[in-house]
């Protein structure tokens, strides 16, 4: 029997962080193959239609994209199911708007507007560093980029600052204690803090202890940590909440205080 790639995705099987309601249809957009995994990405159609409300349906999204108005990391994208992901910069030429895809404290992609100056670069986590053919050194980033002849000081888990116009590495941050990080997986997804301690476990996962702005400490796996800045200073602007997770009672008190001011 002939088999092939799956071309459909049921709405109930779509990732929770897309925030699609179950009763609006049977199917959800199936992400195209691309730089981010299907469970960790946000298709362009979901971003433009469901988040920004720039379109009412898929046909309108395709009409916008075919006018070549939308850029992802400085490149025009016309595929409505193109998988955008963490740290990607989405630009809308006609309105002059720029967005960076980052997580909120509940682990969902948030609509985070940035300036035109900040849209010129993105941060990439180094996943692999090795020698290629004829001894040419190269590194591979979290979004599938291969960069040849990097700085020899750059190691795995470091973060590079990539210029989107020249595709050159401008600078890099070492993965070390006191570096500022954002958690990109697990139950603490979206939280921002400073690395306090690193636990080494042979044959198992390395554990990173992080302390947030309220001096609350939590732990996560090494693979879930993305360095976003040096001691006390982030290289990107952070969304509302600044990556600080509040307890249920603190959120309740905050809502009541805001309601009292209104």
Curated annotation (Swiss-Prot):
Write down what this protein is called. Small ribosomal subunit protein eS4C
InterPro entries listed in its UniProt record: KOW (IPR005824), Rib_uL2_dom2 (IPR014722), Ribosomal_eS4 (IPR000876), Ribosomal_eS4_C (IPR032277), Ribosomal_eS4_central_region (IPR013845), Ribosomal_eS4_central_sf (IPR038237), Ribosomal_eS4_KOW (IPR041982), Ribosomal_eS4_N (IPR013843)
Q: Which CDD domains match?
A: KOW_RPS4 (cd06087), S4 (cd00165)
Q: How does it assemble?
A: Component of the small ribosomal subunit (SSU). Mature yeast ribosomes consist of a small (40S) and a large (60S) subunit. The 40S small subunit contains 1 molecule of ribosomal RNA (18S rRNA) and at least 33 different proteins. The large 60S subunit contains 3 rRNA molecules (25S, 5.8S and 5S rRNA) and at least 46 different proteins.
Any single GO molecular-function term of the entry would be: structural constituent of ribosome
Q: Organism, per UniProt? A: Schizosaccharomyces pombe (strain 972 / ATCC 24843) (Fission yeast)
Any single Gene Ontology cellular-component annotation: cytosol
The chain's disulfide connectivity reads none
Modified residues annotated as Phosphothreonine in this record:
194
Keyword Ribonucleoprotein appears in the UniProt entry: yes
Keyword Lipid biosynthesis included in the entry's annotation: no
């Amino acid at each position: 029997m002939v088999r092939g790639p799956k071309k459909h995705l049921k709405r109930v099987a779509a990732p929770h962080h897309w925030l699609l309601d179950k009763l609006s249809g049977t199917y959800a957009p199936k992400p195209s193959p691309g730089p981010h995994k299907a469970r960790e990405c946000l298709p362009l159609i979901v971003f433009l239609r469901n988040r920004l409300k720039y379109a009412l349906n898929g046909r309108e999204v395709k009409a916008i994209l075919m006018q070549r108005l939308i850029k992802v990391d400085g490149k025009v994208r016309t595929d409505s199911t193109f998988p955008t992901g963490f740290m990607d910069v989405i630009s809308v030429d006609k309105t002059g708007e720029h967005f960076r895809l980052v997580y909120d404290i509940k682990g969902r992609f948030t609509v985070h507007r940035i300036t035109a100056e900040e849209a010129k670069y993105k941060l990439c986590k180094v996943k692999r560093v090795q020698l290629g053919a004829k001894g040419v050194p190269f590194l591979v980033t979290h979004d599938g980029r291969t960069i040849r002849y990097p700085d020899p000081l750059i190691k795995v888990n470091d973060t590079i600052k990539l210029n989107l116009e020249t595709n050159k590495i401008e600078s890099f941050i070492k993965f070390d204690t006191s570096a500022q990080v954002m958690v990109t997986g697990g139950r603490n997804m979206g939280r921002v803090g400073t690395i306090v301690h690193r636990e080494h476990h042979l044959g198992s996962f390395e554990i990173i202890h992080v302390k947030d702005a309220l001096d609350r400490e939590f732990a996560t796996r090494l693979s879930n940590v993305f360095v976003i800045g040096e001691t006390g200073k982030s290289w990107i602007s952070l969304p509302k909440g600044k990556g600080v997770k509040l307890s249920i009672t603190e959120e309740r008190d905050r809502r009541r205080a805001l309601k009292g001011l209104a």
